[in-house]
Curated annotation (Swiss-Prot):
Residues 110-123 have a biased composition (Pro residues). InterPro entries: HD, Homeobox_CS, Homeodomain-like_sf, OAR_dom, Paired_Homeobox_TFs. This is Dorsal root ganglia homeobox protein. CDD domains: homeodomain. It is found in: Nucleus. Residues 33-92 bind DNA. The gene is Drgx. Expressed in the dorsal horn of the spinal cord and dorsal root ganglia. Isoform 1 is higher expressed than isoform 2 both in the dorsal root ganglia and in the spinal cord. Isoform 2 is exclusively localized in neurons primarily involved in the processing of the pain somatosensory modality. Disruption phenotype: Defects in the projection pattern of nociceptive sensory neurons to the dorsal horn of the developing spinal cord leading to reduced sensitivity to painful stimuli. They die within 3 weeks of birth. Mice lacking Drgx exhibit reduced expression of Rgmb in dorsal root ganglion sensory neurons. A motif (OAR) lies at residues 204-217. Keywords: Developmental protein, DNA-binding, Homeobox, Nucleus, Transcription, Transcription regulation. Signal peptide: none annotated. GO terms for cellular component: nucleus.
């Protein structure tokens, strides 16, 4: 018969080395130790919020008194206040970030005006307008007061002083009498007028200008005794026609005036 001999087991040896089971359990619990989440009741939250409304940093005596009142530990109360302050700071930061953010979309909706490259800058436009206004004022001061039939804003094509002066001298030579001073134009005062009309009188119609010219012609002919005084429209002040016997007296006056002009 065969007998199997089994060696005796080693006594006093641990299966995992020399570490005991108690030491292993204590180390495992230390590594895995976690704080439990505290669930606050409605009464506890109301008491905590009331103290937080008074002060965000309660001292240790206030925390201990509050902990005894709501049946919590002082450590739990301190952690709650830390979390509550962090939440309050986050809320304040979010509110401050939303205020400038509300104005940014308005800036995006209204883009800045686009200026044409060929157009002059705003400063040059203002300067040019000011210069044009000063030139117009200086022109009005240079021209001075004008007669009723010599408006300074007539175009150059309608206001030809040389032609008008020749027509008046021709009428005077036909009749042999001098014209009144109001009908004699001043070529020197109107010769420098521009060939364009004023900005304010561009709406004047050609018919109105023709009517004024016709009235003026009638007034001139009336002063020269070529037409009877039956004009319906009022004309410039003119002298009465001298009698037939006084024509001989007026001719020396004309000869004297022509002699003075020739000198």
């Amino acid at each position: 018969m065969f007998y199997f001999h089994c060696p005796p087991q080693l006594e006093g040896t641990a299966p995992f080395g020399n570490h005991s089971t108690g030491d292993f359990d204590d180390g495992f619990l230390r590594r895995k130790q976690r704080r439990n989440r505290t669930t606050f009741t409605l009464q506890q939250l109301e008491a905590l919020e009331a103290v937080f409304a008074q002060t965000h940093y309660p001292d240790v005596f206030t925390r201990e008194e509050l902990a005894m009142k709501i049946n919590l530990t002082e450590a739990r109360v301190q952690v709650w206040f830390q979390n509550r302050r962090a939440k309050w700071r986050k809320t304040e930061r979010g509110a401050s970030d939303q205020e400038p953010g509300a104005k940014e979309p308005m800036a995006e909706v209204t883009p800045p005006p686009v200026r044409n490259i060929n157009s002059p800058p705003p400063g040059d436009q203002t300067r040019s307008k000011k210069e044009a206004l000063e030139a117009q004022q200086s022109l009005g001061r240079t021209v001075g007061p004008t007669g009723p039939f010599f408006p300074s804003c007539l175009p150059g094509t309608l206001l030809n002083t040389a032609t008008y002066a020749q027509a008046l001298s021709h009428v005077a030579s036909l009749k042999g009498g001098p014209l009144c001073s109001c009908c004699v134009p001043d070529p020197m005062g109107l010769s420098f007028l521009p060939t364009y009309g004023c900005q304010s009188n561009r709406t004047a119609s050609v018919a109105a200008l023709r009517m004024k010219a016709r009235e003026h012609s009638e007034a001139v002919l009336q002063s020269a005794n070529l037409l009877p005084s039956t004009s319906s429209s009022p004309g410039p002040a003119s002298k009465q026609a001298p009698p037939e016997g006084s024509q001989d007296k007026t001719s020396p006056t004309k000869e004297q005036s022509e002699g003075e002009k020739s000198v």
